[in-house]
Amino acid sequence: ALINATHMLCCGEDLGMVPACVPDVMHRLQILSLEIQRMPKDPNVAFAHPANAPYLSVCTTGTHDMNPLRAWWEEDRAVTQRFYNEQMGWQGEAPREMTPEIAEFIINQHMYSPAMWVILPLQEWLAIDGKIRIPDQHADRINVPADPHHFWNYRMHITLEELLQKDEYNAHVRRLTAVR
């Protein structure tokens, strides 16, 4: 009924424990799946690669209920190291903090995804610039479902007017998005 009531695309939040029939039903109804690199649908892999996302999907770095990439990077050192070596293909020890170069690399992985849509949280875009991003990466978190005092209280630390004045940054973002 929902699909027939609108001309809008539908996207299903098919994350976590979903019945085995869900992917086939979504595909048959052309409902876009949600593909998150840190939440692979295949239980045999640690990470999903954006290059493997199906066309009928929205590829993103996370949801409002997850840590943004910079905070996630510091959650579990072993997981970060594995991601750095396996998903990024970089050798050596992963930096303790996510650098703008790492954030940009991950964004690029998503931008080249075959997914119909790539929708990235603003926090990830700000992470590519060491001067613009917020110093406290944990302040970028939108929602913590387990904490009734931390819900939807994210506020961007820079105004839109200020961001629009960052010509070099905006040109950089335009170059990154030009591949889509």
Regions from the PLM with identified roles:
Residues 1-180:
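Catalytic cores of glycan-processing enzymes that make or break glycosidic bonds
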